[in-house]
Every structure is written in C-alpha cells, then in structure tokens.
Amino acid sequence: EGISRHIRRMTRDDREFSIVVFGATGDAGRAVCRYLATKQGARPVKWAVAGRSKAKLETLVSSLGGSSAPSVLLADACDASSLLRIAERATLVFSAVGPYSRLGEPMVKACLVARTHWADITGEVFWVGEMEAKHGEAAAAAGVTLTSLCGYDSVPCELSLHVARKALKLGARHSELLDAEAVTQLNVPEGGGAPAGTLLTVLTALGSNALGLAKGYAAFARSNDESAALWPVLRSMLGSLSLGWSPQAGCFTLAHFMFWCNVPVVHRSFGARGANPLRFRDREQ
C-alpha cells in the first residue's frame, strides 16, 4: 500500500550486479544459472545468485564453471528486508521462486521500491493479471519493467506464432495469421518428470479461491484490442480441450497441459502487436 510513495531514487547505472537470480538452487534457477555461466560474451556481465542456503548456493557456483563466477547473496522470500537488500544491488532480479501466487509479490514490491527491473518464469496467468492490476501504475511511474511468463510458459508458442505471422505477411499474398494450432510432442527422459516448483504451483492453484482466480484471468485478458478480449480467449481455450485429429501433425491430439496459460498469453501478445483476432489451439500428441 502506498508503495509508489516509497520508491527510492537510485539510478540503475550504480548497481553492483546486472542480474541477480533469486531462487537459484531450484530446478529452473539452476538452468538459468547454467545458461548465464556459459553464454557470457566478450564483456561478461556481473551477476549473483540468491537464496536461503549459503551452502547450496556455493555448491551451485562451484559446479557452474565458465569465465564469470557469480557472487552469492542470501535472501528469503518471507523476509522483506532481505529482498530489498538484493533488489537494491541489481539492475534486474530474475525470480525462479514459486509458487508465485504465494511467494512472488514480496519480491515484486521490493523491486518497485528499489527501482529494479523484474522477470520471472511463472505460468500463473491469474497472478500476473493481479500484479498488473495492483502494481502496474507504480511500475510505470518508476520506470520499472515487470516481465512475466518468460519460460516454457509461454515463449515457445509466442515466438513460433510471431515467426509464422511474419512469414505470412512477407509472403506474396501478404496474408494475416487468423487460425493456428500448436502441437507438441513431449519426450520425458527416464527418471524425469515435472519440477517440484511446477507441482507446488498446480497444487496451490487447485486450493485457491475460484473467484480470485477468475478475477486474475479477467484482469490479464483485459484489453481494448479484440484479439485479447475475454471471449476470443475462452473460444480458443474451449477449442483446445477436445480430442481431435491434426492433419498437419498426422496424429490425434489433446489439450496441451499448459494450454490454460499459453492461450491467453498468445492472445495478449497478439493484441499488443495490433494483430487481427486469432483462433489458437494449444495441443499435444
């Protein structure tokens, strides 16, 4: 409450770290850290890993290798002062701490106070809508970017459809993408399965208030653009549910296990680019 009144006037050029990965020792956090450790260019960025356990963080750092070892910072999602301390030292906090509907907002608030950009890999569309409704104006006033849904939910779908739409527009007929179907084949390696954070997120959503979830979804879908309005999103979600035959993939398909996230996100991103209304089905073999 009143968070915009407490935003600190600190320029991001003064920050000690370009990126802090919060929740670095979880499944998703480790993947992000491995990427950062091995993809540094000629001018490596200074970055840090953050979490509750110093021992686990140090073990992670020693396993990474690479030319730019991250620093270790301690913070707890339930300790607001520790979150503010790491936010003040970073240009961007990348949070891999979920479920976000239970653990995400304190770090978002810390980033707003410290004028620090935020990114996450949540698939909790209802939570993203809630955060936008609660903190969107304060973030815009502070020049802070809050970027969600940056992982498997829903980057592959968004990029694939962006490339398809661009190819159609550049083609001889200058066509527009109006109908699309994504078909995913999941290959789970032996001993593999869903990350613990994903399972906790699903369980948290199942135990949440249905009205609260609906309000969050509605807030996310809120747009003056027809493509991102609630009815086209619901139509695409219903179209993803049924068992059907895909002539393009040559197989029967069911709803993708993340269709409830990917469909509204794709509609939102298409609407933001001024695209025509889209009928999109998210399916898997």
Name the predicted role of every residue range.
Residues 18, 91-92, 117:
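Structural motif
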Residues 122-144:
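Rossmann-fold NAD(P)-binding glycine/threonine-rich loop
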Residues 29, 141, 162, 166-285:
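C-terminal catalytic/substrate-binding lobe primarily of soluble NAD(P)-dependent oxidoreductases
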Residues 17-37:
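N-terminal Rossmann NAD(P)H-binding glycine-rich loop of SDR-like oxidoreductase domains
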Residues 99, 110-128:
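ADP-ribose/adenylate-binding Rossmann-like module
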Residues 60-67:
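Short, conserved SAM-binding/catalytic segment
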Residues 74-92, 96-102:
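Conserved Rossmann-fold cofactor-binding substructure of NAD(P)-dependent oxidoreductases
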Residues 41-56:
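Conserved glycine-rich Rossmann-like NAD(P)H-binding loop of the short-chain dehydrogenase/reductase
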